[in-house]
Design a protein with these regions (language model features):
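Conserved small/polar residues in nucleotide/adenosyl-binding loops
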Residues: 178-180
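Acidic, proline/serine/threonine- and glycine-rich low-complexity intrinsically disordered segments
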Residues: 174-176
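N-terminal regulatory/effector-sensing and dimerization cores
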Residues: 25-121, 152, 158
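A short, N-terminal "cap"/entry segment at the start of jelly-roll beta-barrel domains
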Residues: 1-27
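Amphipathic alpha-helical segments enriched in hydrophobic/aromatic residues interleaved with Lys/Arg
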Residues: 115-172
Length: 180
């Protein structure tokens, strides 16, 4: 898919104050982050839900509530809103490329209700999907389409965002059921 159409940031430095701000002028944001010189983030949390898909370079190490998660290229990690975490981006390579999807809590909750997923266990904790299921269900293409949907007129964009987030939620829920 056309990753070049996703907004790209190189060595972006995130502050705790920036992380605590909600999404501005959108309910969903997709960005492509490359870290080379800036190889770690501050400990932070967000008022929105965040998914990270490493697409090239290094494995990423996330520290969350005393636990360590190694997220390899092709895997997907989900952070519920308000979860404190920090990342180190150069574990086994000198750079890291990641697609980062940020979803406003109001949009998240509306999609969860509409898809009748109020009891989906994965939504309440850190969740990591392996590269095989990420490739099978082509999450990278879904996330690139989400980024491209920013170009739609506002009223249409919100409807498309709801459809895309609902699709993602249903797929992750089904993947969880298949692996139980």
């Amino acid at each position: 898919m056309e990753i070049e159409r996703v907004t790209h940031y190189v060595d972006n430095v995130l502050t705790q104050a920036e992380a605590r701000m909600g999404l501005r002028n959108t309910r969903l944001l997709v960005a492509w982050y490359t870290n080379q010189k800036n190889d770690q983030s501050v400990v932070h949390s967000h008022p929105y839900h965040e998914l990270v898909l490493p697409i090239g370079g290094s494995t990423v190490r996330y520290s969350i509530d005393g636990s360590v998660y190694l997220v390899h290229v092709g895997e997907l990690i989900y952070f519920p809103a308000q979860i404190y975490h920090a990342g180190i981006f150069n574990i086994d390579n000198d750079h890291s490329d990641r697609l980062v999807i940020q979803i406003d809590d109001a949009l998240w909750q509306a999609c969860r209700r509409n898809a009748n997923l109020k009891n989906a266990a994965w939504m309440h904790s850190i969740t990591v999907l392996d590269p095989d299921v990420c490739n099978k269900w082509d999450f990278q293409s879904l996330f690139v389409r989400m980024a491209q949907s920013q170009e739609l007129p506002a009223q249409m964009r919100d409807i498309v965002f709801e459809a895309q987030v609902s699709e993602m939620m249903l797929l992750i829920t089904q993947i969880g059921r298949a692996h139980v």
